[in-house]
Each structure stands twice: as structure tokens, then as C-alpha cells.
Amino acid sequence: MGMRRTFTPQRLVPAIAAGALVVGLGACGDDNSTADRPTVTAPNETIPPPDTVAPTTVAPGFEHPTGADEVVVEIAYEGGFLPADAAFRETPVLLVSGDGRLFVSGPQIAIYPGPLLPNVLVSDLGEDGIQALLDLAAEHGLLTEREYDRDDLIADAADTVVRISANGETYEHRAYALGLDTDETGDRAELQGFVAAATSELAMDGAAFQPEHYLVRATPVDDTSGFDVEPTIVEWPAESALLLADAGDCVAVPADSVDELFAEANQLTFFTQDDVTYQLSVRPQLPGDGC
């Protein structure tokens, strides 16, 4: 199957156009004539009473996780030449949860320093949208295990990662430097085509996501003088139960305790606690994510 679209991933500002996946339903007919067949009348035919409800026929489709914290489809860029703190902040380009919510990375404001919190939008994709997305994945051959050739002539690029859970299986597709400086062919072209179609046909006009928890990484800063813009130093709230010294890798923090603080902060807002200054990397906790 050949490539359908050309797509060059943008890591921080994915081009996700407004729109929605549309499910096409085909119908099949029977061309065989029944004119020559004898008509048989069944004896004592039973006709259901008027108040009997005919059984509902469930349309066939893909089985998938249905929990609010379970992931059906995820598209992300991982790795590449990024500092650990910057990599920690990154969220998937697209994520669909089992209950039909669609999460996308929204536009990022082009200022420095940027906001502390990533811009994640959420909308309702629904079951029809999930089925259409899984059908698109099947069309591109992604409901099976695949290995992808690696182009080592490109340095420090990210992996394009697509994870799909359907029909009791979970598939991870990982391709290095997908779509960068080359015309993709074969399986790489199919993966590229799926990413392009999914991210262009799913809407990004959702509402700002309000998480129950943020995932936080705190890095001590010994010298605050080496930045192009002078950092803002803020005292960490005394009433907070979080010890920043314990957040060197990752800690989940209830959102309602830090919402206002994080919303007003940028990436050069540093926090002090117990005479130590910390720089925070923060992302909202999405379905399937955690420390």
C-alpha cells in the first residue's frame, strides 16, 4: 500500500487542523434472484405482540479499552536532542482515551520564556470517532507488529511513536526521524500516512484540559545568573505538602493545590523551599500517564 500523504512532524507546535474523522459505512446487496424459488409458508407462524421490542443488532467494530484512564491511540515524539527537563514537559501530539476523549497538543505561544504549563486541549471524540480512527489504523496496516528501518544519517532526531490498543492487543510503532529529509516508502510510508491523516483530520478546537494531577520534576539551581532573561524567584507555598527535594525524578501533585500558582508561572519562574532554589518541569497527568 503506497503513501497517501506527506507529513513532516513538528515537535512543539503540531499542525492539527480543525475537522473530524467521518466514518463511511458501506452496504452490500444480494444480486441473486429469488424468482425461481418456491414460496414456503411456515405453519402456525408466530407474530410477536405489538409491544414486543425487536432485538437491537450491534454493528461490528473494533474492541478497545473503555476506561477513562486507558489509552486507545497515542501519537507522540520521543527522544531526540532535548534536555531531560524539556523532554519531561512534552505531551503526546494526540491521545484518545477509552471513554472517547480526544487530547491534543494545542498551539504554543511564541514568547520566551514560555508558560510553565503545556497547552493541552480536550474534546469529545465519541465511539464513532474511535472506530473511525481504528479503521484508519487498520487501513495503514498498523494493527499488527512491525519493525521499521532506521536512517542513521540523520542525527539527534526524535522517534515517531504510535501506540494502539484494539481487539485485545497493544501495538507500538516506533520509527526514527520519520519524514525528515527523505521520501518514505513501505512500512515507514504507511506509518507516516497514518500520523498525517490522524493529526490533520482530528479537531484541535477543544477546551483547555483541567487535570486532577500535575506531574512535577524539580531540579536544584545553584546559579540563576546564566540565563538570557532574569528568572523570577517565588517562595514555594508553605501549606503545600510537596517537598521539592523529593521531586527530583517525578511526583504527582493534586492540581487544585497548585493550579493558580502554575498558571501564573513561566519556564523561568523558579521556586525556593528550605533555602534551595528549584526549576520545575510540569505536565498535566493524562490518561495512562504517571510517575
Please give the residue ranges for each predicted region:
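Bacterial N-terminal signal peptides that target proteins for export
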Residues: 2-16
